[in-house]
Swiss-Prot record:
Enzyme class: transferase
Catalytic residues, chain numbering: 92 (proton acceptor), 272 (nucleophile)
This enzyme's EC code(s): 2.4.2.29
Gene3D superfamilies, alphabetized: Queuine tRNA-ribosyltransferase-like (3.20.20.105)
Record carries keyword Glycosyltransferase: yes
Residues given in the record as substrate binding sites: 92-96, 146, 195, 222
Protein name (database record): Queuine tRNA-ribosyltransferase
Length: 390
């Protein structure tokens, strides 16, 4: 089940405001989706995700297949029952994780043979197997199995011929994924994935073939895989707005706050990335005025919160009143610096709450600006603020 309602568009860009209706609820777009690799978003309670406005989260098909395994998940009726999340879930196909195994895997037309990174067992993932796993997970949005085209192969930029061969196999896998998805009578929604590397002609070919399959939604894959930023932005400017206008568009694995704003301007509706959670665990925080390295010595005695305009629990405490509005209930940079220096678990947890809140609030501001016809102004202000620096 999937219904996508296009609510408004921005006349000065390809940005759009929409509403996605799935089996487990509605999602207002544009949206950022926190990543819950092993069935949890690292370092944050599900209650906190609800409080900060998370509407949909991700699960990782590959890792959940390996642990806890399908028998366990089936016993709970799928991923929603297992992790006690009652809103929509999107699961990836497992293709990127298998691709990341490098020498431990062998890709053939039939699928991917690989050694389990957990116990070394020999395993096989095909489009059909991926659909079977994701049907057991009962995720609201299911991704086709694809081959992620790398930016470089053995230190050299992937050739157009190699990218074409990879893209065409992903198209064949898309058809096999669709056939198996339908055979299983899966009531959820299957997305296709546009590939083609950094070659716009291949992206266009992939896009046209997938659009002809009339899938419920489409993703742009194979970006943020080691290419220079200008190359990623070029593909981002080329592909999203060419996808069917009445279907949701998902940019996979991207990215920084600036990337999200630019993606929205190019017509993207959905984003996911591990950056807010991973960076939080490594002491890098996103703020209105740029990124903050909380481990730096200059924060040792700083009484300010991470972001004076932020209303997250970390910055504003239980009152939810931002520092700039007179609130003084949040945690200081000095305290967070201390937690990081001491290796206290609470440090990364509070940082994760802040980063995820920042991303989700950024998307909320974008939706509000689109509703008000003020996206161009918001885009300019966000760019200027972030460039200013903390």
């Amino acid at each position: 089940m999937l219904q996508f309602d296009l609510l408004t568009t921005d006349p000065a860009s390809h940005a759009r405001r929409g509403r996605l209706t799935l089996r487990h609820g509605q999602v207002q777009t544009p949206i950022f989706m926190p990543v819950g690799t092993h069935g949890s978003v690292k370092g944050v309670l599900p209650r906190s995700l609800h409080e900060m406005g998370a509407q949909i989260i991700l699960g990782n098909t590959f890792h959940l297949w390996l642990r806890p395994g399908l028998a366990v998940l089936q016993g709970f009726g799928g991923l929603h029952g297992f992790e006690k999340w009652n809103k929509p879930i999107l699961t990836d196909s497992g293709g990127f994780q298998v691709w990341s195994l490098g020498a431990l895997r062998t890709i053939t037309e039939e699928g991917v043979h690989f050694a389990s990174p957990v116990n070394g067992d020999k395993l096989f993932l095909s489009p059909e197997v991926s659909m079977q796993i994701q049907t057991t997970l009962d995720s609201d949005i299911v991704m086709q199995l694809d081959e992620c085209t790398p930016y470089e192969t053995r230190g050299q930029r992937t050739t157009e011929r190699a990218a074409c061969q990879s893209m065409q196999m992903s198209l064949r896998w898309a058809k096999r994924s669709q056939d198996e998805f339908q055979r299983l009578n899966n009531p959820n929604a299957l997305f296709g994935i546009v590939q083609g590397g950094m070659y716009e002609n291949l992206r266009a070919e992939s896009l046209a073939a997938l659009a002809a399959m009339d899938l419920p939604g489409y993703a742009i894959g194979g970006v943020s895989v080691g290419e220079p930023k200008d190359e990623m932005l070029r593909i981002m400017a080329h592909t999203p707005h060419r996808l069917p206008a009445h279907k949701p568009r998902y940019l996979m694995g991207v990215g920084t706050p600036e990337d999200l704003v630019e993606g929205v301007a190019q017509g993207v509706d959905m984003f996911d990335c591990v950056m807010p959670t991973r960076n939080a665990r490594n002491g890098t925080l996103f703020t209105r005025f740029g990124d903050l390295k909380i481990r730096n010595a200059r924060h040792k005695t700083d009484p300010q919160p991470l972001d004076g305009s932020c209303t997250c629990y970390t910055c504003a405490g239980p009152s939810g009143v931002a520092w700039d509005q007179g609130g003084r209930d949040g945690f200081s940079r000095a305290y967070l610096h201390h937690l990081e220096r001491c290796g206290e678990m609470l440090g990364p947890m509070l940082s994760t709450v802040h980063n995820l809140h920042y991303y989700l609030n950024l998307m909320r501001e974008i939706r509000q600006a689109l509703d008000a016809g003020e996206f161009t102004q918001l885009r300019a202000r966000l760019k200027a603020d972030r460039a200013r620096g903390v």
